Every structure is written in structure tokens, then in C-alpha cells.
A protein has these predicted regions:
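Conserved alpha-helix/loop element of class I SAM-dependent methyltransferases that forms part
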Residues: 34-52
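A short glycine-rich, Lys/Arg-flanked "PGG" loop and its adjoining helix->strand segment in the class I
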Residues: 136-148
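C-terminal alpha-helical "lid/dimerization" subdomain adjacent to the S-adenosyl-L-methionine
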Residues: 158-209
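Core SAM-dependent methyltransferase catalytic element
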Residues: 216-234
């Protein structure tokens, strides 16, 4: 289905409810620049570096698009998807069945779930929705629960320390969304809905957060304007 949620005035803050879940794949593909390409890069990289039968956990898996891509590249992997939206997981489970992919789904709060012994943890545009006061503790939990030499992949929307540059990047991004078919009104309504819900960090803040959480290295492996994908190693 096509994302037309913000064609009407918003009545509440943004949340991943049934209405969002039904259009999520269209929404994210049109809202995140090079989403398909960056997701494919993540899956290609993981398919090369993960050991046989590795345990891979996607926290905030939404409709499982990335996990399905990973399954197609490495059918031996043990895949787990966690999300707190039943509507998202209903779609994810249906897609997994259609593709014949064995993926273990769990509907729970990613801050509370158990993923000990994972060889890879993925947070694809998820960390930015966690309250800043809880992010450091959560990232420490990820590092502690990863296996030795485990990999942490996280994708995030960014802000820039240079406020003028940040403003320019936001305007470039909004031009991108217009080119994807969103009206100025829809863009403005979604921006209002996400205020105080999506709270981005700078690239350096994200890297520092990972290093302070115990990861031995962290690199940006993909970046476009105010979007980036990071890989950290335990």
C-alpha cells in the first residue's frame, strides 16, 4: 500500500501502529534515501563475515524486510526478529511464510528482551527512537550480550554540529522526499509527528556512544547527507 498517512492533519505523535505497519515498506523506501541499497550492503557484508549458523538478531525488525534479504543470501543463519508492534510482526510473519524463511519473531520491548549469545545485532533506524537517557545503557547491554568478536550494525538519521550545514542537509532531504512524491504538507505533518519522538545524534556522538559501551571499533560504512549506517565490533 502507498503511504498517505500524513495527507490529513495529525492527531497524535508518531507511533508504529496498524496504519503505519500497513504502509511501512512504502514509507521507509520513500523516506530513507538509498534504503534498499544500504540494506543490501548490510546483508552482503554480513553474509561474508558471519560464521556458519550464526545467530543474528534484528531489534525493531518491523516487517522483516532486512531479515528476509539476509535469509536469501545466507540460508544457514539463525534469524530472530524482535518488535513491540503486533501489526508489524503480523506482516513480517506472513512475508516469512511466503518466502519459506524460518525466522523466529518475538513481540516485546527491545530494551527488555534477551538476545544473549548473538553473533550479530541489528538496529535499523531504531536507536533514534529510544530516549537518549536510555541509549548508553542499552548499547552497553548489546555489547555485553554479543558473542566474542560479535558485530553490531546500526543505521541512524543524523544531525550536524554545524547548525548551518544541518539546516542545508534537512532542506536537501526534504527536496528528496518531494521527489519521492510527498507533498510539502505531508512532509511538514510528519516532521511535527516525529518531534520529541525521533531524536538523532551526530555521527561523532553515535561513534562515541558505541566506543564508550565497550566496542573496540566503529566505522560508518554508508552515508548520505543526514543518514548513516555504522558497524561496531566487540
Amino acid at each position: 500500500m502507498k503511504d498517505e498517512i500524513f495527507k490529513e492533519p495529525i492527531k497524535k505523535q508518531f507511533e508504529f501502529d496498524k496504519s503505519v505497519a500497513s504502509v511501512f515498506d512504502d514509507m521507509i523506501s520513500r523516506s530513507v534515501p538509498f534504503y534498499k541499497e544500504s540494506s543490501n550492503l548490510i546483508c552482503k557484508l554480513l553474509s561474508r563475515i558471519l560464521k556458519e549458523n550464526a545467530k543474528c538478531v534484528d531489534l525493531g525488525c518491523s516487517t522483516a524486510e532486512l531479515l528476509l534479504n539476509l535469509h536469501q543470501k545466507r540460508g544457514d543463519l539463525n534469524l530472530f526478529g524482535v518488535d513491540n508492534s503486533p501489526s508489524m510482526l503480523e506482516i513480517a510473519a506472513a512475508k516469512a511464510t511466503a518466502y519459506g524463511a524460518k525466522i523466529n519473531f518475538s513481540c516485546e520491548d527491545i530494551l527488555e528482551c534477551d538476545f544473549k549469545g548473538a553473533d550479530c545485532v541489528i538496529l535499523n533506524y531504531t536507536l533514534q527512537f529510544i530516549r537518549p537517557i536510555k541509549r548508553a545503557e542499552f548499547m552497553r547491554k548489546i555489547c555485553e550480550n554479543l558473542s566474542d568478536n560479535g558485530v553490531f550494525i546500526f543505521s541512524e538519521k543524523l544531525v550536524y554540529s554545524d547548525k548551518t550545514l544541518s539546516k542545508e542537509m534537512i532542506e536537501i532531504y526534504e527536496d528528496y522526499k518531494e521527489n519521492q512524491g510527498y507533498s510539502k504538507y505531508e512532509i511538514a505533518e510528519k516532521r511535527k509527528a516525529l518531534e520529541n519522538v525521533l531524536i538523532p545524534y551526530t555521527e561523532d556522538e553515535n561513534k562515541t556512544l558505541a566506543l564508550n559501551s565497550g566496542f573496540k571499533s566503529v566505522e560508518a560504512i554508508f552515508k548520505w547527507a543526514n543518514f548513516a549506517v555504522f558497524m561496531a565490533r566487540k
